[in-house]
Amino acid sequence: MTSAPWLELSRTVRFSDTDAAGVMHFQQLLGWCHQAWEESLERYGLTAGSVFPGGRREQPSVALPIVHCHADYRAPVQVGDKLLIRLKPERLDPSSFVVNSQVLLNEQLVASGCLRHVAIDANSRRRCALPDGVDRWLEASSLGRIQPL
């Protein structure tokens, strides 16, 4: 089964993404994973301002802080490499979700990352339900895969 088009994103490795050894600097990976998630939301139809604080529109009433992240590096990634970032989001419960990212070079897995988010009320900072738009994105992203209720 192929992924929905908003779950597969391309990225070319730039010189500024690399370290003195000429390979991707370790800290780039989680940034790429987050940027891919942001682009995926936009491709799905959710504007950045409707999800993230600091946009030009009204401020969202729900914040989605990252409460856990990790990354694994499997092969060197170098300047000019054309990467595919494949997202595999999963709802964990009504107030949290994880976005797993696979980074592929010529269909070979070269890295992976994980970002776990929890929904909190922007004013009280207490856990709350996911925003409707993000909830719809998660539901649409899981079509074809069985997920627990």
UniProtKB/Swiss-Prot annotation:
Class of enzymatic activity (EC top level): hydrolase
The terms under GO molecular function for this entry are:
1,4-dihydroxy-2-naphthoyl-CoA thioesterase activity; fatty acyl-CoA hydrolase activity
- Write out the pathway annotation from the protein's UniProt entry: Cofactor biosynthesis; phylloquinone biosynthesis; Quinol/quinone metabolism; 1,4-dihydroxy-2-naphthoate biosynthesis; 1,4-dihydroxy-2-naphthoate from chorismate: step 7/7
Which residues carry out catalysis?
D19
Please provide the Gene Ontology terms (biological process) for this protein. Answer: phylloquinone biosynthetic process
Q: Which UniProt keywords apply?
A: Hydrolase
Which reaction does this chain catalyze? Answer: 1,4-dihydroxy-2-naphthoyl-CoA + H2O = 1,4-dihydroxy-2-naphthoate + CoA + H(+)
Disulfide-bonded cysteines: none
Spell out the InterPro entries in the cross-references. 4-hydroxybenzoyl-CoA_TE, DHNA_CoA_hydrolase, HotDog_dom_sf
Q: In the Enzyme Commission scheme, what number(s) does this protein have? A: 3.1.2.28
Q: Do the record's keywords include 4Fe-4S?
A: no
Per the record, the similarity remark reads: Belongs to the 4-hydroxybenzoyl-CoA thioesterase family. DHNA-CoA hydrolase subfamily.
Q: What does this protein do?
A: Catalyzes the hydrolysis of 1,4-dihydroxy-2-naphthoyl-CoA (DHNA-CoA) to 1,4-dihydroxy-2-naphthoate (DHNA), a reaction involved in phylloquinone (vitamin K1) biosynthesis.
Query: What's the protein here called?
Result: 1,4-dihydroxy-2-naphthoyl-CoA hydrolase
